[in-house]
Swiss-Prot record:
Disulfide bonds: none annotated. Keywords: Molybdenum, Nitrogen fixation. One of its GO terms (biological process) is nitrogen fixation. Belongs to the NifQ family. The gene is nifQ. This is Protein NifQ. GO terms for molecular function: molybdenum ion binding. The keyword Ligase does not apply.
Length: 180
């Protein structure tokens, strides 16, 4: 496992478990190694943003694809990223990076924490609470994150069609509505 120093240990600001970003980067790197695309496409960030994230949380870590632009995002991914940034309550580079990563990984098929490579849902919720406090507060009912994102988007009167993922056919439906 990759080990990352906590850049907030001696400075002000939100405290984010650097290990969580290690899991996310490791997941992206595994997918790159498996031929699923460049790291920029796996995490939804430009190479420059990946380099800045690396410099902040994992100085010296070798990352591929740092010369690539940010991949184009589809409408669902853009809507989720906009929602996250709007609800976040903070305007930091770290919040912007995490919003892009969460939106991109929300396009995958499993639970968001699994698609991020995190050990459990509480890791995801804890990272969001530290990094995107307004988003965490908005999810007061502790709804599963992907479901929460789509419910928030679909509740907007401007949306006439919502492509929310269907839970009824999922084998893990009971787990989604169980306490953490």
């Amino acid at each position: 496992m990759l080990h990352f120093p906590d850049p907030f240990a001696t400075g002000p600001g939100p405290v984010i478990p650097a290990e969580a970003l290690g899991f996310i980067l490791a997941q992206g790197l595994r997918e790159c190694a498996a031929g699923l695309g460049p790291l920029t496409a796996r995490l939804g960030l430009s190479g420059a943003d990946l380099a800045a994230l690396r410099d902040r949380f994992a100085p010296g870590l070798e990352l591929p694809d740092l010369d690539l632009p940010r991949p184009e995002a589809g409408p669902d991914q853009q809507a989720i990223e906009t929602l996250i940034l709007w609800r976040a309550g903070v305007a930091t580079p770290e919040a912007r990076w995490l919003a892009a990563i969460l939106a991109r990984r929300s396009m995958e098929t499993r639970h968001l924490w699994e698609d991020l490579g995190l050990p459990s849902r509480p890791w995801l919720s804890g990272m969001i609470a530290h990094f995107l406090p307004g988003l965490a507060a908005a999810n007061a009912r502790n709804m599963r994150w992907k479901k929460f994102f789509y419910r928030q988007i679909c509740s907007d009167a401007a949306f006439s069609l919502c492509l929310s993922p269907s839970c009824d056919d999922c084998d893990e439906r009971a787990a989604c509505f169980a306490p953490d």
